[in-house]
């Protein structure tokens, strides 16, 4: 078996890991892959290795709901730290505490948020010698290959020799073979980007997408995959490996585009290699495969209306706010008199097929009565737009959704006139969590479902997640049938953390004293 030979070769070049746990864990995160799409690929024979694992009974496959919003920061905070309410409303938002917009693709922002999460006193699945690759948060990992660690050049330079350890010994392809394939991939990617941008007459994001295709999806993934092989030979107790290629392409080309599906199918061979190594090393690994959310087609508002969401909500005639909406938002309480507030230019953060609307710079979000008093015109535009399916906002100590002229709390969502594309479970879960999510907008608007598997999008992209459709809320988890853990029936990513910690961490995560 080739993996045994590779393991012996790597073992002669690298020292064993110092940390040990009762069982070793390899956690493979397929970013953005909904369970339905994986099922289709298995039936179509596009993922032969994964299909064999499941059909043989070696692995179990189940769908999972991780909570809402259906975004990677929220999921990773729950998975790694076990936080049920991490106060992470999207991939990008206006942070009331910092007084500015933050983006998880910005290393300094990711570092600030990681420190904030860590300060809540929970230990991570990666504490005690674990390694993470392409995670947003370092979360206590011994290595430094997450978005948050890129914030420190000094830290990265100190870690350079450690990160390179075993890379040459762990290669599975010859140098010239790799360079030839890399060159061909680069050429094809450049041609595809040029063709796409020319057809759309729009080059937005295309240069960064090309860089992502070449540096992250090819070089970066090859590096992370090789390092995971090396880590297993060394006996690193927990390895968290994020495969982001499908997600990156789905955003720019659509979740069912030929390019996105080819990235999904490509992962099958890597999974086969990783699994082979996991069973060939001295202390075998339990391999768990999961996804964080699904993807839906996004039809950009800018294409549909010729304007951005900011223009739709803040400009033009507001129209009348319906009496039913006013009554539902008041909930028997008297209207407030308009109260002068500090000047604040509204901030609208387009997060894909949903958006956060900030109408105040105060540390506390505006509640329904304050919005009725100060910003009735914005409420009217949002609730009357045919391209906005759900408007979520806080009402008293809870939250409600305005859907087609009606106001519904989390326990009333079942009778709301929602499109069948939306997940009522996800809508209710989001409303229950919104009061504690102080970083979320004063309004959170979700694009209307306009076709099967597709919603209006507010950002300039053609695949979105973070919203509340059934596809976005349907994730997957796949685990060994003989592993001492049951990952079926999970209803939140914090539950996943708890079940994994019970088995794969020396002791359950305990509260740390935070000064």
Task: Label each region the model flagged.
Residues 1-59, 304:
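Active-site-proximal N-terminal segment of extracellular/periplasmic enzymes that hydrolyze or transfer
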Residues 20-39, 53, 79, 238-244, ...:
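Beta-strand elements within well-structured catalytic alpha/beta cores of enzymes
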Residues 40-77, 82-86:
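Short, structured active-site-proximal loop/turn typified by the sulfatase FGly-forming signature C/S-X-P-X-R
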Residues 78-254, 353-356, 409-420, 440, ...:
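His/Asp/Glu-rich, glycine-adjacent segments
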Residues 81-95, 157-166, 261-272, 306-325, ...:
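Acidic, His- and aromatic-enriched active-site or binding-groove loops in soluble protein domains
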Residues 218-219, 231, 239, 246-287, ...:
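A long, amphipathic alpha-helix that forms part
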Residues 268-306, 400-402, 407, 414:
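Metal-dependent active-site segment of extracytoplasmic phospho-/sulfohydrolases and closely related
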């Amino acid at each position: 078996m080739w993996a045994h030979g590779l393991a012996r070769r790597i073992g002669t070049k690298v020292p064993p890991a110092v940390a040990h746990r009762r069982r070793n864990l390899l956690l493979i995160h397929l970013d953005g892959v909904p369970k339905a799409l994986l099922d289709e690929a298995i039936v179509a024979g596009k993922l032969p290795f994964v299909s064999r694992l499941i059909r043989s009974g070696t692995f179990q496959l189940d769908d999972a709901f991780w909570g809402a919003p259906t975004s990677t920061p929220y999921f990773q905070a729950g998975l790694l730290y076990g936080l049920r309410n991490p106060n992470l409303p999207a991939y990008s938002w206006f942070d009331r505490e910092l007084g500015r917009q933050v983006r998880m693709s910005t290393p300094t922002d990711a570092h600030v948020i990681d420190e904030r999460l860590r300060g809540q006193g929970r230990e991570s699945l990666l504490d005690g010698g674990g390694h993470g690759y392409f995670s947003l948060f370092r979360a206590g990992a011994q290595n430094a290959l997450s978005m948050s660690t890129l914030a420190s050049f000094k830290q990265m330079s100190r870690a350079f020799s450690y990160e390179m350890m075993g890379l040459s010994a762990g290669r599975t392809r010859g140098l010239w073979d790799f360079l030839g394939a890399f060159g061909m991939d680069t050429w094809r990617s450049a041609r595809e980007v040029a063709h796409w941008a020319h057809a759309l007459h729009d080059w937005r994001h295309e240069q960064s997408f090309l860089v992502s295709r070449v540096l992250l999806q090819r070089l970066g993934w090859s590096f992370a995959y090789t390092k995971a092989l090396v880590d297993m030979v060394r006996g690193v107790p927990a390895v968290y490996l994020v495969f982001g290629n499908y997600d990156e392409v789905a955003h720019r080309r659509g979740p069912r585009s030929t390019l996105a599906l080819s990235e999904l199918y490509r992962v099958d061979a890597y999974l086969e290699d990783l699994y082979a190594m996991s069973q060939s090393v001295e202390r075998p690994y339990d391999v768990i495969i999961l996804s964080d959310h699904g993807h839906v087609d996004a039809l950009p508002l800018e294409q549909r209306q010729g304007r951005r969401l900011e223009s739709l909500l803040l400009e033009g005639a507001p129209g009348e706010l319906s009496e039913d909406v006013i009554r539902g938002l008041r909930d028997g309480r008297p209207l407030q008199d308009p109260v002068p507030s500090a000047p604040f230019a509204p901030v609208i953060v387009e997060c894909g097929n949903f958006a956060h609307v900030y109408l105040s710079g105060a540390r506390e979000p505006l509640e329904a009565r304050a919005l009725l008093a100060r910003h009735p015109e914005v409420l009217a535009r949002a609730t009357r737009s045919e391209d906005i399916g759900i408007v979520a906002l806080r009402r008293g100590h809870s939250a409600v959704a305005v859907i087609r002229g009606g106001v519904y709390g989390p326990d009333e969502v079942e009778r709301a006139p929602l499109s069948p594309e939306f997940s009522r479970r996800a809508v209710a879960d989001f409303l229950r969590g919104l009061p504690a999510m102080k970083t979320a907008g004063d309004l959170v608007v979700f694009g209307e479902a306009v076709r099967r598997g597709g919603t209006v999008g507010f950002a300039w992209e053609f695949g979105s997640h973070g919203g509340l459709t059934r596809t976005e809320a349907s994730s997957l988890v796949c685990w060994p049938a003989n592993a001492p853990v049951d990952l079926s029936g999970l209803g939140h990513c914090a539950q996943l953390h708890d079940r994994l910690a019970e088995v794969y961490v020396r002791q359950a995560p305990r509260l740390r004293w935070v000064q």
